[in-house]
C-alpha cells in the first residue's frame, strides 16, 4: 500500500495561526507533533511503503525538515506550483507510479486530519484493502452521529456483492443546513466524507479518463514536462495552469459505478475550524481549552490560544480567542466558519497578516521581525549550522549586522571575513553579500535595515544552494524581507 499525503491546503479557517506560507498541517495543534507529522507516524506499520507527499513548492523545505525530525523518508515529493484541487494531484501521482511499474493500492489522505484510534484505522484499512483489490474505489466514511453542517455527506446503500461491512455509495450531498443534517442523522445510513480514499493507481486513472478526460490529458502532458529536482518532482507550471480545478469526488467518485464506503470509526476530525479544534483537545472542568499564557475567570466552553502575551478572559461562553504577535481573532464558537471569509476580506485589503507570521521559516533557518518604522526594520536572524543565505543584492536598502551568538562568515562584494559574538559589519546599498554559518551551533544575529524601500521584492539573487528563484521569494509584497 502506498500512502499519498495531500499537503497543499492553506488552512485559512484556522487563521491567524494558519497562514499561506505556514499552513495548519505544519503546526502542532493537538500535541507535540504537527498534523503532518502525526499523519506520517500513523502510516508506519507493516505493509506500508514509504509515502508520497504532494505539496506546494513553497513548502518543500518545511516538509523535508518535518520528515527529518521524525527520521522518516519519502519515496517522492511532488511540488505543485499552485493548487488545482485533489483530482489533478492524485492523477499526477498515479501516473508517476504506473510509469515506474508500481501499480499498487494508493491510500490517499489529507495531511491535516486527526485520527485518535490507530487500531480502528488499521481495521478499516484491512477491510478497504480486500475491497480495493477487487477493483472497487473505496471512500472512508465517518458514521454521521450528530448534525454537522461543516462536512459533506455520503448516502450509502447495501450491496450483496461487496464484502461484509462495505456499502455502495448512492449519493454525495454537499454540506447541508442544520435541518437537513438532522434528517440525515435520524434516517441513518449517512456518513461524513473523510476525504480519504483507497484504490489501485491504474483503476483511478481508468475512471478519471472515462469521467474527466480533460484532467487526465492535461496531467499526462504536465507529467511529461515536469522535471526532477533532487528528491522532488517540480510540476510544470505552464501546463498545469491549464488543468481543470476539481476534486476527486466531483471528477470521479460521484460518477463511477465502483464507489463504495468503508466505515471509519476512529476518532476522526478534519480539524477544519476552531470549533473542531476545540473538540479534539483536552478541556478543563469548565470545558475550556487553553494554550499559552492564559488566565480564565468565570468562563465556559472557550478556546483561548495565547502566543507570547498574557491573555486573560472573564465571563465568556463559547468564545474563541486567538492571539499571535501581529494579529488577534475573536469569534463566537458557532460562527467560526466565517473565518475563511474574514481571510478573504483581509486579502482584498492587501493585509499581509494572512501570508506570513512575523517569524518566517526558511531552509537555512528563520527570521523574526522585531521592530519597524518608515525607513527602518529590525530583525532577529537565526542560521542553522552549515547553512547559508543566498548571494544577493538590494537596490534600496543598507544593512547592519550584529552577531549575538555563534560565528558568521560574511561575503560583502570581494571581501570574505569572519565575525564572532559582539562584532558587527555594514552592508552598503547595492553590495553583493551573503551570510553563512560555518560553525557547529546556531548563528544568531540582529539585522538593522535602513533605506527608502524595504519591500520583500527588493532582492536580486545570484546564487542559492536551495534552488530558489526571485519569483519564489518575492511572491507577495510584505513588510518583511525574504532571504
Curated annotation (Swiss-Prot):
Disulfide bonds: none annotated. Keywords: Alginate biosynthesis, Cobalt, GTP-binding, Isomerase, Multifunctional enzyme, Nucleotide-binding, Nucleotidyltransferase, Transferase. Pathway: Nucleotide-sugar biosynthesis; GDP-alpha-D-mannose biosynthesis; GDP-alpha-D-mannose from alpha-D-mannose 1-phosphate (GTP route): step 1/1; Nucleotide-sugar biosynthesis; GDP-alpha-D-mannose biosynthesis; alpha-D-mannose 1-phosphate from D-fructose 6-phosphate: step 1/2. The keyword Isomerase applies. The keyword Phosphoprotein does not apply. It catalyses: D-mannose 6-phosphate = D-fructose 6-phosphate; alpha-D-mannose 1-phosphate + GTP + H(+) = GDP-alpha-D-mannose + diphosphate. InterPro entries: GMPP_N, Man1P_GuaTrfase/Man6P_Isoase, Man6P_isomerase-2_C, ManC/GMP-like_b-helix, Mannose-6P_isomerase_type2, NTP_transferase_dom, Nucleotide-diphossugar_trans, RmlC-like_jellyroll. Its EC number is 5.3.1.8, 2.7.7.13. GO terms for biological process: alginic acid biosynthetic process; GDP-mannose biosynthetic process. Its cofactor is Co(2+). Produces a precursor for alginate polymerization. The alginate layer provides a protective barrier against host immune defenses and antibiotics. This is Alginate biosynthesis protein AlgA. It comes from Pseudomonas syringae pv. tomato (strain ATCC BAA-871 / DC3000). The gene is algA.
Amino acid at each position: 500500500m502506498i500512502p499519498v499525503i495531500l499537503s497543499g491546503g492553506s488552512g485559512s479557517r484556522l487563521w491567524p495561526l494558519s497562514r499561506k506560507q505556514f499552513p495548519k498541517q505544519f503546526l502542532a495543534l493537538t500535541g507535540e507533533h504537527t498534523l503532518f507529522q502525526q499523519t506520517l507516524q500513523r502510516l508506519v506499520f507493516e505493509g506500508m511503503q514509504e509515502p508520497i507527499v504532494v505539496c506546494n513548492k513553497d513548502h518543500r523545505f518545511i516538509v523535508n525538515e518535518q520528515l527529518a525530525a521524525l527520521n522518516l523518508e519519502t519515496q517522492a515529493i511532488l511540488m505543485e506550483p499552485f493548487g488545482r484541487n485533489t483530482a489533478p494531484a492524485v492523477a499526477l501521482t498515479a501516473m508517476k507510479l504506473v510509469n515506474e511499474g508500481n501499480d499498487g493500492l494508493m491510500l490517499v489522505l489529507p495531511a491535516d486530519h486527526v485520527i485518535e484510534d490507530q487500531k480502528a484505522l488499521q481495521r478499516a484499512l484491512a477491510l478497504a484493502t480486500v475491497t480495493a483489490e477487487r477493483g472497487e474505489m473505496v471512500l472512508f466514511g465517518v458514521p454521521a452521529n450528530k448534525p454537522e453542517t461543516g462536512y459533506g455527506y455520503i448516502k450509502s446503500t447495501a450491496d450483496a456483492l461487496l464484502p461484509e461491512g462495505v456499502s455502495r455509495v448512492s449519493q454525495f450531498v454537499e454540506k447541508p443546513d442544520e435541518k437537513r443534517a438532522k434528517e440525515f442523522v435520524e434516517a441513518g445510513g449517512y456518513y461524513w466524507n473523510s476525504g480519504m480514499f483507497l484504490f489501485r493507481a491504474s483503476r483511478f486513472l481508468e475512471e478519471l479518463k472515462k469521467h474527466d478526460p480533460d484532467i487526465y490529458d492535461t496531467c499526462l502532458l504536465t507529467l511529461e514536462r515536469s522535471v526532477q529536482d533532487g528528491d522532488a518532482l517540480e510540476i510544470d507550471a505552464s501546463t498545469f495552469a491549464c488543468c481543470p480545478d476539481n476534486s476527486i469526488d466531483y471528477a470521479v467518485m460521484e460518477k463511477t459505478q465502483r464507489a463504495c464506503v468503508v466505515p471509519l470509526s476512529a476518532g476522526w476530525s478534519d480539524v477544519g475550524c476552531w470549533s473542531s479544534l476545540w473538540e479534539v483537545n483536552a478541556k478543563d472542568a469548565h470545558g475550556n481549552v487553553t494554550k499559552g499564557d492564559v488566565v480564565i475567570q468565570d468562563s465556559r466552553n472557550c478556546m483561548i490560544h495565547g502566543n507570547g502575551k498574557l491573555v486573560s478572559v472573564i465571563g465568556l461562553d463559547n468564545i474563541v480567542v486567538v492571539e499571535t504577535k501581529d494579529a488577534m481573532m475573536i469569534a463566537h464558537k458557532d460562527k467560526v466558519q466565517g473565518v475563511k471569509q474574514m481571510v478573504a476580506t483581509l486579502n482584498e485589503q492587501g493585509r499581509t497578516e494572512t501570508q506570513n507570521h512575523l517569524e518566517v521559516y526558511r531552509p537555512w533557518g528563520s527570521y523574526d521581525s522585531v521592530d519597524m518604522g518608515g525607513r527602518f526594520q529590525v530583525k532577529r536572524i537565526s542560521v542553522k549550522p552549515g547553512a547559508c543565505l543566498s548571494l544577493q543584492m538590494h537596490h534600496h536598502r543598507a544593512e547592519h549586522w550584529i552577531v549575538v551568538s555563534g560565528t558568521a562568515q560574511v561575503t560583502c562584494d570581494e571581501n570574505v571575513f569572519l565575525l564572532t559574538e559582539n562584532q558587527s559589519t555594514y552592508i552598503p546599498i547595492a553590495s553583493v553579500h551573503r551570510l553563512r554559518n560555518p560553525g557547529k551551533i546556531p548563528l544568531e544575529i540582529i539585522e538593522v535595515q535602513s533605506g527608502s524601500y524595504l519591500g520583500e521584492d527588493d532582492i536580486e539573487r545570484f546564487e542559492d544552494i536551495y534552488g530558489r528563484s526571485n519569483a519564489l521569494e518575492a511572491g507577495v509584497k510584505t513588510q518583511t524581507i525574504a532571504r
